[in-house]
Amino acid sequence: RPVLAILEKFRSSVHGMVHVTGGGFYENVPRMFPEANKKRELEGKAPLISVFKKGSWEIPAIFTELENRGAAKDRMFNTFNMGIGFMLAVKADKAEEIVKAFADFAANDNGRCSTMKASVIGKVVAASGKAETQEEQVLFED
């Protein structure tokens, strides 16, 4: 419901959506841009990639525990959603307004979305090269 409400109000500002399931960030996030990247390839332009800001969202304690028990954090992003169940790629100049709209929806939905949080966690940019592998299509920066 919250995503539908956002689409009703901001459809022209939403460029991609993805449900982050098994396969984590690396397998799911690149699926947001297949048509845009096909077009960019035909135009001789570099593909779009996603760059996420480390520490921009709270990673649930279960993943910290897995890391403490020896799981490699970078590989966990290839398996788990790391607390991000759904992502929207939106116009940068509308991002904060959309985050606020999600918060307003959650606050006024009789508690059904009380645990839902929205935040800006990264950006979409043109790759500096071909970006053929998943690791080249999804980057993390400090």
Where are these regions (language model features)?
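Glycine-/charge-enriched secondary-structure boundary and capping motifs
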Residues: 1-142
